[in-house]
Amino acid sequence: MGDSVTFSGGGDLDNGMTVNVSYELDGGNYDDYSMKLGLGDGNGTVTFSGNSVNAGGVDAVKDIIPTAYTAVYENTNAVDNGLATTSGRNTTSMWGYANSFGSLDVSLGYNAKNSTASTDDGAESSIGLTWNDALMDGLTLVAGRFDDSNIAENNTYGLKYTAGGLTAGYQLTDVDYETSSSNDQEAVHMGVSFAVNENLSVSAGRQSVEITTTATDEVNTGMSASYTMGSITVGAAMNEVDAVGGVEGVKAEVTSLNLAFAF
């Protein structure tokens, strides 16, 4: 069970720019923080963030699969395989930039230290591209790349289509480590969500991850739902993983329940 308190605020500057600050207090060793500067006049937003809060880049597109509450790989084990950030990223003292050009959203991320927190190993950089209403109404296409210096290259591509209350998504991700002995990964992630009404949403999904050094694919499946009543939101999920890390016979199941209040 986790608990936290978040303080946030912001305002407009006389020159047309905007400032927003968020700070979360919790039981972690470091508190999450985010500072955003809106440049005004369509010039985008610069973000500086830390701990588990990312400033931008591939995180904007690493998982576009629709879900009512949480992703199918959440809470079942310590490592989220098959994502474009699986090789590890450093979100402490991270910079980001985001802007929109017509129907194209661009998100950039940069950190002078990679996930080993060593400048000697080089910097991290990433990009996330989102094309809204691509080719037809309701269709979204995404592409992203995360370069973890000399650790790995992560690439992802996906599409999402919405028609009425129904949304479906499909995404491919490739994690290519620099060392030949590491566990390169290829993942296929798909899911569908449905808004039953303005208060209730349900979803189901599946993710399979092929790991080069193992004979069995890791498979994550799950169902979730969320219900909103006034200022109260209830979320629930049942997730299951088979062959954790590609190890046959290693399984885990988890049931999650979340209650949130908006003041």
Residue ranges of predicted features:
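Outer-membrane beta-barrel proteins
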Residues: 1-263
